[in-house]
């Protein structure tokens, strides 16, 4: 059964704090195992990569078989049904349109002293996209990661995807082509992350690694950060639904289960001021669970990490939502916009009963790569900005240096950095 909390209970604060602190991540020896793999690939390159692929994916290759060929991609596209390809194309187009609006603008201006200042944006040269394999192979995630990179101007986009027993999801390859991926390699796990970061004879290193994966992939991304950039450390998926008594219990239950079916560690939460709705949603969840193909996963998620939180009024939901900082926030109330405007922390917000989070997963246009595990308190979802760098620009002439130089020299001396002061003083004939 899910956790039931009531804001009016005397022990609510204690129970809510415990609920927030409950760990949903796989831990134990994952980091040590990932470190061993990353270090091995860094040392031995392709040899270590091929050994790990044989061990974990039961796929024996030589280095020439790592890259997925153009012929394989073409065959995969032909194997996909037309309706699904059309849906992927629609998703790609909407994602591209949305992300083009995020492109930042360069700036250059002159201040009252005549100093020229500004900044400019440039795309990173290369990015690596990690795509999970097996049952968690999601072509939509390929588009969500690849399209913003291409919009930003990344010229080399490398995809790695595990191929258990040699099998690749044709839709993943089709999405890679639609998204503008330039290279695809049939490797996964911590070993693929290591190859993208350190490079091997076959796979050239990239500047940044993005994309979700299991606990070993997440640990490997932590380990290579600094050598390369990373997007975020993705945890189990989560949704928070805030609803009043106008909410449709069947719809809300379906949305809660849409997250629960992802992973046994996924989290689905309802906050409501309606006791009737809370009871109806709980009944609807139990009924719908019986009809889901992934009922075992969804049932475990709902039982272990689900929650229904009662509040006296929806004003009480606001600080709770900010504390939860959910990856996905759905608001099904009479005035969802007004409530959303008062909530600070959420990865993405879905307004109104006709905006299920699943639309955002696929064809809404906004990105579904979002901060989890309360990291929406300080971070944002994937965007064009993740694939770009901002460089500041400064230009002084003789007059501007004379106006600003003495103050800079004073600060240099105050910090004990005499060479700093001298580099200015020589230009002003003061050193």
UniProtKB/Swiss-Prot annotation:
Annotated protein name in UniProt: Histidinol dehydrogenase
Top-level taxon: Bacteria
Cofactors named for this entry: Zn(2+)
Swiss-Prot/TrEMBL GO biological process terms: L-histidine biosynthetic process
Keyword list, A-Z: Amino-acid biosynthesis, Histidine biosynthesis, Metal-binding, NAD, Oxidoreductase, Zinc
Co-factor note (free text): Binds 1 zinc ion per subunit.
Pathway assignment: Amino-acid biosynthesis; L-histidine biosynthesis; L-histidine from 5-phospho-alpha-D-ribose 1-diphosphate: step 9/9
Organism: Bradyrhizobium diazoefficiens (strain JCM 10833 / BCRC 13528 / IAM 13628 / NBRC 14792 / USDA 110)
Family: Belongs to the histidinol dehydrogenase family.
GO CC annotation: cytoplasm; cytosol
Entry-linked Pfam families: Histidinol_dh (PF00815)
Catalytic reaction equation(s): L-histidinol + 2 NAD(+) + H2O = L-histidine + 2 NADH + 3 H(+)
Lineage: Bacteria, Pseudomonadati, Pseudomonadota, Alphaproteobacteria, Hyphomicrobiales
């Amino acid at each position: 059964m899910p956790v039931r909390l009531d804001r009016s209970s005397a022990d609510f604060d204690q129970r809510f704090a415990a609920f927030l602190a409950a760990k949903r991540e796989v831990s134990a020896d994952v980091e040590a195992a990932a470190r061993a793999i990353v270090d091995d690939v860094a040392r031995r390159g392709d040899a270590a990569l091929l050994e790990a692929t044989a061990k974990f994916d039961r796929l024996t290759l030589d280095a020439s078989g790592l890259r997925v060929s153009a012929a394989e991609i073409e065959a995969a596209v032909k194997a996909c049904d037309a309706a699904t390809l059309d849906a992927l194309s629609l998703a790609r187009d909407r994602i591209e349109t949305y992300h083009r609006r995020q492109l930042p603008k360069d700036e250059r201006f002159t201040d009252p002293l005549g100093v020229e200042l500004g900044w400019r944006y440039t795309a990173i040269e290369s990015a690596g996209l990690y795509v999970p394999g097996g049952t968690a192979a999601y072509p939509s995630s390929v588009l969500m990661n690849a399209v913003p990179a291409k919009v930003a101007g990344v010229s080399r986009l490398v995809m790695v995807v595990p191929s258990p027993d040699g099998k690749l999801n044709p839709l993943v390859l089709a999405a890679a082509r639609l998204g503008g991926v330039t290279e695809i390699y049939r490797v996964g796990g911590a070993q693929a992350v290591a190859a993208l970061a350190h490079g091997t004879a076959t796979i050239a290193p990239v500047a940044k690694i993005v994309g979700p994966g299991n606990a070993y992939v997440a640990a490997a991304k932590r380990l290579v950060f600094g050598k390369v950039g990373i997007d975020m450390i993705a945890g189990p998926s989560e949704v928070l639904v805030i609803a009043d008594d106008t909410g449709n219990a069947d719809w809300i239950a379906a949305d809660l289960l849409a997250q629960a079916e992802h992973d046994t560690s996924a989290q689905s939460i309802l906050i409501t001021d309606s006791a009737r709705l809370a009871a109806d949603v709980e009944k609807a969840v139990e009924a719908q669970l019986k009809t889901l193909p992934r009922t075992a996963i969804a049932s475990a998620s709902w039982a272990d990490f689900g929650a229904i939180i009662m509040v006296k009024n929806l004003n009480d939901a606001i600080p709770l939502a900010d504390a939860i900082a959910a990856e996905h926030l759905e608001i099904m109330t009479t005035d969802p916009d007004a409530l959303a405007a008062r909530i600070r922390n959420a990865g993405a917000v879905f307004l109104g009963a006709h905006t299920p989070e699943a639309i955002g997963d696929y064809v809404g246009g906004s990105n579904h790569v979002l901060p989890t595990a309360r990291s929406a308190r300080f971070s944002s979802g994937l965007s064009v900005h993740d694939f770009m760098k901002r460089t500041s620009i400064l230009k002084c002439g003789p007059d501007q240096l004379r106006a600003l130089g003495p103050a800079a020299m004073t600060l240099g001396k105050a910090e004990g950095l005499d060479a700093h002061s001298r580099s200015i003083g020589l230009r002003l004939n003061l050193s």
